[in-house]
């Protein structure tokens, strides 16, 4: 009987040790996962998620949607939200999410070292992952003086030659918000009114539509994000190559504040159930491998290191280093200025 009790005790001990092992941090790492809410829908991103899982064993559960819809969803889910990370485009949207209380502060020496201060929230609530520059694009054979800065687009020589997107477009809102911050509201108002006077047509279409309009001669100059140019440059379609051949690109304000840039970025959510994995994931997206893939796969500028792929052909440029959070802080003011200027 004593031997049987001893055997039973050993069995119970082994069972208890196994149960404790399954509850240990090591076990949670091997079975870890994170829930990502993303407004980016690029094959490049999907490849990164798969690579992250292969390297860490952490499964990425992806929920996709529009930026505003995802923000509203997280707010509606409240403390029970399964979201660990929100990724979205435009610093203004990231600022709005932070103002709504969606994010939590992240203290990461890795992110502090990799992400410049002007490309992250002042309180480390969100971090830039990739960049795009808003450049001036002109038709090479237009015969007009090549503009050197955004303010040049208000000059009378460009009367009826400027094509633009709608004022409600988030990239135009952030551009104007940046101008408000760096030049003041009065100067920003004059700029918006001057550009409206030079419109070749009613604002319409996306950035690619503006590029095609310039190439066709419908207008002579526009502004566009560099990754739209990169897509056309990387295209094998002869029609796209013909468009690119007719276009010239200017990085504005190289003798002054620098060219306006915007970002895609990520923040760890306030009630993230998998906080450690979420921070590890954001750090991974700023790694050399991930940054190179952003550049080569989606024609974006990396936060870390130099550009590669088609957009590298555009050359280096000076960036406006106003903190990207400004785009959100000044957005309401930008809306009012556009409205007063008649920019629809």
PLM regions: where:
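Periplasmic-binding protein-like
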Residues: 160-168, 284-307
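A structural signal for short loop-to-beta-strand junctions that line the ligand-binding cleft
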Residues: 81-86, 104-136, 151, 163-164
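A bilobed periplasmic-binding-protein/Venus flytrap-type ligand-binding module shared by bacterial periplasmic
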Residues: 135-142, 261-274, 293
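An extracytoplasmic/periplasmic, membrane-proximal ligand-sensing/linker region
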Residues: 188, 299-344
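Early extracytoplasmic/lumenal segment of secretory-pathway proteins
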Residues: 32-96
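Ligand-binding pocket segment of bilobal, Venus flytrap-like solute-binding proteins
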Residues: 178, 182-252
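Short helix-loop capping/hinge motifs at secondary-structure junctions, enriched
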Residues: 141-148, 180-189, 272-278
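Short beta-strand->loop
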Residues: 37-40, 122, 138-140, 145, ...
């Amino acid at each position: 009987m004593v031997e049987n009790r001893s055997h039973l005790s050993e069995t119970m001990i082994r069972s208890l040790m196994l149960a404790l092992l399954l509850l240990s941090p090591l076990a949670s790492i091997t079975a870890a996962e994170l829930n990502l809410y993303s407004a980016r829908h690029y094959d490049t991103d999907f490849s990164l998620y798969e690579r992250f899982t292969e390297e860490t064993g952490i499964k990425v559960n992806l929920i996709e949607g529009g930026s505003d819809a995802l923000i509203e969803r997280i707010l509606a889910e409240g403390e029970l939200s399964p979201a660990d990370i929100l990724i979205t485009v435009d610093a203004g949207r990231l600022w709005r999410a932070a103002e709504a209380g969606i994010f939590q502060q992240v203290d990461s020496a890795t992110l502090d070292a990799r992400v410049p201060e002007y490309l992250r929230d002042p309180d480390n609530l969100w971090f830039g992952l990739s960049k795009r520059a808003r450049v001036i694009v002109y038709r090479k054979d237009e015969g007009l003086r090549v503009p050197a800065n955004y303010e040049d687009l208000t000059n009378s020589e460009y009367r009826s030659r400027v094509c633009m997107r709608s004022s409600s477009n988030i990239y135009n809102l952030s551009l104007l918000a940046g101008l408000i911050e760096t030049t003041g509201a009065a100067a920003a108002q004059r700029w918006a009114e001057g550009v409206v006077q030079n419109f070749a047509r009613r604002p319409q279409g996306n950035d690619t539509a503006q590029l095609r309009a310039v190439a066709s001669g419908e207008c002579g100059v526009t502004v566009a994000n560099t990754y739209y140019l990169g897509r056309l440059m990387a295209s094998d379609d002869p029609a796209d190559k013909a468009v690119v051949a007719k276009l010239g690109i200017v990085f504005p304000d190289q003798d002054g504040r620098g060219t306006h840039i915007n970002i895609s970025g990520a923040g760890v959510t306030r009630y993230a159930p998998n906080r450690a994995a979420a921070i590890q994931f954001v750090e991974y997206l700023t790694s050399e491998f991930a940054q190179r893939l952003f550049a080569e796969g989606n024609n974006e500028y990396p936060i870390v290191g130099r550009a590669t792929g088609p957009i590298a052909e555009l050359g280096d440029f000076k960036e406006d280093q106003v903190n990207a959070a400004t785009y959100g802080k000044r957005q309401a003011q930008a809306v009012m200025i556009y409205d007063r200027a008649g920019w629809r």
